[in-house]
UniProtKB/Swiss-Prot annotation:
It comes from Aliivibrio salmonicida (strain LFI1238) (Vibrio salmonicida (strain LFI1238)). Coiled coil: none annotated. This is S-adenosylmethionine:tRNA ribosyltransferase-isomerase. One of its GO terms (cellular component) is cytoplasm. Belongs to the QueA family. It catalyses: 7-aminomethyl-7-carbaguanosine(34) in tRNA + S-adenosyl-L-methionine = epoxyqueuosine(34) in tRNA + adenine + L-methionine + 2 H(+). Gene3D superfamilies: QueA-like (3.40.1780.10). Pathway: tRNA modification; tRNA-queuosine biosynthesis. InterPro entries: QueA, QueA_dom1, QueA_dom2, QueA_sf. The gene is queA. Monomer. Keywords: Cytoplasm, Queuosine biosynthesis, S-adenosyl-L-methionine, Transferase. Its main location: cytoplasm.
Amino acid sequence: MQVSDFHFELPDELIARYPQPERTASRLLHLNGNSGELHDGQFTDVLDLVQHGDLVVFNNTRVIPARMFGVKASGGKLEVLVERVLDDHSVLAHVRCSKSPKPGNQLWLGENQEYEAEMVARHDTLFEIRFTSEKKVLDILDEIGHMPLPPYIDRPDEDADKERYQTVYNEKPGAVAAPTAGLHFDTDILEKMKAKGVEFAYVTLHVGAGTFQPVRVDNILDHHMHSEYAEVSQEVVDAIKATKARGGRVISVGTTSVRSLESAAQHALKQGTELAPFFDDTEIFIYPGYEFQVVDALVTNFHLPESTLIMLVSAFAGYDNTMKAYDQAVNHQYRFFSYGDAMFITKKTS
């Protein structure tokens, strides 16, 4: 398939620049993957769509305030976007400035250039940066970093984003982009789901800035996915097996949870074993023709045209169903992308 097969026209006014006043106030488009039926609704309809005995899998990564501003020794301004925290004092980052720093160059980061750092090495398009402070990197980021809003939100981050560009169940810091399907859940709806007999499990995938990179090839088979770190614990594996055994569904909240679970499944297939814990980097690329091993239903936001995420949704729901759903979403004025509305999709099995 061609990347252009996943194109759709999106009016600029449908891109959500701010979240709804309440997390659950978004709309929800329900897509039945087998019949192709579409139903417009509200996000709170999730309570009717999940069933007793289902397992809902969330990504518990925490978004770090990964964007920093500062200057080089020459005085030139620069912007640093952390891609990954390497240890307590070092990060791998994207650097934007007029002239790329070289190994050994000093950087001063923060509004008042309060933190000194050194450019240690360059790794392809990323820079390894080490802070000289005794403070830990995560503490420095909490002090001087900005929330790394996606480029299409196209506004400076605000104080409210520290809460709203973060799930209520976040636990493990490391992401530089939110697992956005999870932004719709508040504590009230989670408690109501539990009261209904729905079980929860948590994987971790630290979403990287690569999730916003455009696909730069024509044929999707030529695309190489960026690498992200994922964790699927023994507890999650046991919960999945128990759910399948009782006839329940595994419902993934977000494409990052899908990629975590299916990475574990693909690793097990290659090893010739049953589903097992997975703690590793993954470059899994899911596109039409992929056979899902774990996930039965998916909660996800509306994604960018020609992105790997709309390809994943097309693999899950069927290409024609997906493009029809996106056409309806545009016509019915759904809000798109990170702060936008959501879909609930059951897998196409026939």
